[in-house]
C-alpha cells in the first residue's frame, strides 16, 4: 500500500523532531519560537515530514511556527502516554506508586483531548496522529495495557479526521499487538539494528526483515517506520562503542533512505537534532 495515496500527500523524506537544547527538557523549559523557527528552517531544506511526540507547549510552538511562517512541513502529531501499570521487566525503573499511576491515567486522557483539539485546529498541517510511543514493549518504563491503547485509538478516531496509529517497536506487532493492529488506521514500527547488536554490514537487512515481518502479517494495513537510525556515540551500555560513529551512521542512513524511497515506505529518521537532556 502506497503511503502517498493513503495520506493524500506527496512523496518526501521524514524525520523525528524534538528541539530541546542545553538546559531545556520536557515539562520544565521549552524551546522558544525563535529557536523552533531556526530548527525548522534547517529541516525544511531536506525533509518534508516531521514527527512530534507530545501535545505539549513545544509541539504547539512548532505548529504555530509552521502556520505563521507559511512552511510546507507536514506533521505526524503524537500524544505521549505515561505509565498506567508497573513494569518489573524494565531495566531502569518502571515501578510507581498507585497514586502516580492514577494521575498518569488522567493526564493520558488529557493528552488525547489535546491531540484531538490540535488535529482539528491544524488539519492542513497535521496529516496523521499517534496515541502513544513505545508503551507496550516489554522493556518500557511507561507501560500501558493494549486494552487501554485500543480505547485511546477509538477515542481519537471518533474526535478527529486524520488517520490514527500507535508507534511501537516492531516486535510487539508480531504477537502482543495483534488486536490493536486491527483498530489502528495504519501500523507504525521502530527498528534499531544497532540496539540488537547488529553490525553495519547486517543493519540494513535486519531493518528490511523487521519491516517485512510486520507488513506480511498485516497485508491489508499500511506500515510506516516511525523511528529508524544509528547512533554515533555510546556510553558503553547496550551498544558497543566500536559499533557507533559518524561514518557508520552515514552508511546506514544512505542505505535506509535509498531502500525506503525505492519501496515507497514512509520512514522517519531518528532524529533531526541531539537532545542533551536524554544523555547518550
Model feature map: region roles:
Residues 1-4, 52, 152-155, 163, ...:
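Substrate-binding and catalytic surfaces of secreted/luminal carbohydrate-active proteins
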Residues 2-38, 42:
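Boundary/entry segment of secreted carbohydrate-active catalytic domains
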Residues 4-10, 41-44, 61-75, 114-126, ...:
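Acidic (Asp/Glu)-rich catalytic clusters
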Residues 11-17, 48-52, 73-79, 127-131, ...:
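Hydrophobic faces of well-ordered beta-strands that scaffold small-molecule active sites
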Residues 34-58:
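Catalytic domains of carbohydrate-active enzymes, especially glycoside hydrolases
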Residues 51-61, 83-86, 105-108, 137-138, ...:
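Acidic-and-aromatic substrate-binding clefts and catalytic sites of carbohydrate-active enzymes
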Residues 62-162:
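Substrate-binding cleft of extracellular glycoside hydrolase catalytic domains
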Residues 77-79, 88, 127, 133, ...:
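Aromatic- and acid-rich polysaccharide-binding/catalytic face
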Amino acid at each position: 500500500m502506497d503511503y502517498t495515496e493513503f495520506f493524500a500527500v506527496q512523496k518526501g523524506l521524514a524525520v523525528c523532531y524534538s528541539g530541546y537544547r542545553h538546559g531545556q527538557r520536557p515539562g520544565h523549559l521549552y524551546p522558544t519560537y525563535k529557536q523552533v523557527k531556526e530548527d525548522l528552517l534547517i529541516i525544511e531544506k531536506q525533509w518534508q515530514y516531521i514527527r512530534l511526540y507530545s501535545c505539549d507547549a513545544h509541539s504547539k510552538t512548532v505548529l504555530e511556527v509552521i502556520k505563521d511562517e507559511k512552511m510546507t512541513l507536514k506533521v505526524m502529531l503524537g500524544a505521549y502516554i505515561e505509565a498506567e501499570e508497573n513494569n518489573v521487566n524494565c531495566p531502569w525503573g518502571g515501578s510507581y506508586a498507585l497514586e502516580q499511576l492514577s494521575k498518569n491515567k488522567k493526564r493520558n486522557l488529557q493528552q488525547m483531548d489535546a491531540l484531538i483539539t490540535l488535529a482539528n485546529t491544524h488539519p492542513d498541517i497535521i496529516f496523521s496522529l499517534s496515541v502513544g510511543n513505545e508503551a507496550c514493549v516489554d522493556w518500557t518504563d511507561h507501560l500501558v495495557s493494549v486494552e487501554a491503547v485500543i480505547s485511546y485509538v477509538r477515542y481519537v478516531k471518533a474526535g478527529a479526521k486524520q488517520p490514527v496509529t500507535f508507534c511501537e517497536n516492531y516486535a510487539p506487532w508480531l504477537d502482543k499487538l495483534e488486536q490493536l493492529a486491527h483498530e489502528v488506521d495504519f501500523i507504525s514500527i521502530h527498528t534499531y539494528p544497532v540496539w540488537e547488536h547488529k553490525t553495519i554490514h547486517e543493519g540494513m537487512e535486519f531493518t528490511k526483515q523487521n519491516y517485512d515481518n510486520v507488513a506480511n502479517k498485516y497485508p491489508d494495513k499500511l506500515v510506516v517506520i516511525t523511528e529508524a537510525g544509528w547512533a554515533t556515540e555510546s556510553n558503553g551500555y547496550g551498544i558497543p562503542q566500536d559499533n557507533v560513529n559518524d561514518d557508520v551512521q552515514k552508511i546506514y542512513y544512505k542505505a535506509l533512505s535509498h531502500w525506503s524511497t525505492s519501496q515507497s515506505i514512509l520512514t522517519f529518521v531518528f532524529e533531526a537534532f541531539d537532545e542533551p537532556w536524554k544523555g547518550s
